Structures are given as C-alpha cells and as structure tokens.
Amino acid sequence: FKKRAARRCKGKRENTMKTEKFKVTPLERAWILYDVGNSAFVLMIATLVPIFFNALAEAGGVSKVDYLAYWGYASSIVTVVTAILGPILGTLADTKGFKKPIFMLCLFVGVIGCCAMGLAGTWLAFLVIFIIAKIGYSGSLVFYDSMLGDVTTPERMDMVSSRGYAWGYIGSCVPFVVCLALVLGSSAVGLSQMTALSIALVITAVWWLVVTLPLLKKYRQINYVEVEQHAIRQSFVRIGQTLK
C-alpha cells in the first residue's frame, strides 16, 4: 500500500512539474491569440449588438415582438448555413493549399462585417450584415481548429487548446471594457449612444484583426491531403452514410 501511495504521489509531482514547466512556442501563442480576437466579437454579439439592433428596429417602427423574432430568424439562418457549409469547409481545411487562404477570407468577412454593422442605417441592412459577419466568424473557426495539428504536437494539443480557451475569455474582456465604458459614457464625451455603439464595433473588429496578425504571419500548413476529384461530394456522401 505504501509503495502504491508513493508512486501516486510521485506521479502527481511529475504532472505538476510538467504543468509548471509548460511554455507555449511563438507559433502556439499566435494560434492562441486568435481565440483572444474572435472571443471579443462573440462577447460583443452577446451583449451590445442586440442593443444596437433594438434601437434600429424601434426607429424603423418594428414592434418588440417582431424584432425579437427577426433576431431569432437571423441567428437560425446563421446556424443552418454554417451546418450546410461545414462539410465543404472541413474538406477544404484538410486539402493542400486551401486552409490559410480560406481562413483569411472568412476572417476578413467577419472583421469587415463587424465594422459594417455599425454603419447600417436600417434594421434590415443590419441583420443582413450580421448574418454575413457571423457566417464568416463560424467559417473561420473550422480552419482555426484544424490548424492546431500544424501548430503543435499531439502531446501538447490539450494544453495549448486549454490555454486558447482560457486566454480567449480573459483577453476578450480588454476591448469589451473599453467599448462598454464608451457606450455608458457616450454623453460625457459628446457622442450619441448609437455613434458610441458604432465605434465599439470598429474597436472590436480592429482588435480581432490585430491579434490575428501573428498567426497569419507564422502559420504554415504541414498536414494535408492532396487535391482529390469530387472530394466535397464524397464528404456529403459520408455524412449521409453516417446518418443512416
């Protein structure tokens, strides 16, 4: 019993030492930073963006019941489109030469959409831009997650991934605090609340893009499959077989 207890204590000490000594590489840090960027967008969407849409909808004569329904419809459209595009994007993420370019495309769609939401003059235009931006964000995550195998080793994946998750939560608060202070104190600086919300969206978009730059600079695709004929169609076939 004493020997088993000693081995367990030794194993715990070794695991603790490994955790304490764990340091991320520059490439791993660049990958983690993308979570810091896109999490700021998610936090903005969950908090301040509905206020912006609410104001636009009321200005457009839309009732409270209707604008809540429209917001739900927009979120549902994003979910359905993302689900349909998922197999296509997943196939492209595994194919040689596609991962980084399409990741950048999705990133720029999300970032530009985030900025453009603040420029929308009507609730309908806002919803259309919101849908496009959210699809861009969701698409980027497909490629971002698939990058982990190129960024680190299998033994380090869990640690790197968990740090991305944690840093994302913490880092997203930085621009959010600035944006929240701007919106709440908009009258003190001579801005309307709508103008402050528009600026907050731009701040979030800039944050998202800037913290992603290290990943765009450092990332190189290592693991891939060669381009195959009918690869996308085969992806849907495999999904159909799985569902059966």
Language model: regions and residue ranges:
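Juxtamembrane intracellular "pre-TM" segments in multi-pass secondary transporters
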Residues: 18-29, 220-244
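Helix-loop boundary and gating motifs at the non-cytosolic
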Residues: 21-79
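Cytoplasmic membrane-interface "Motif A"-like loop-to-helix N-cap segments
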Residues: 93-107
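C-terminal ends and interior cores of transmembrane alpha-helices
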Residues: 107-122
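Hydrophobic core of transmembrane alpha-helices in multi-pass small-molecule transporters
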Residues: 113, 124-140
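Cytoplasmic helix-loop-helix junction between adjacent transmembrane helices
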Residues: 135-166
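Glycine-rich segments within core transmembrane alpha-helices of 12-TM secondary carriers
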Residues: 161-183
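C-terminal membrane-cytosol helix-exit motif in multi-pass small-molecule transporters
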Residues: 175, 179-184, 205-224
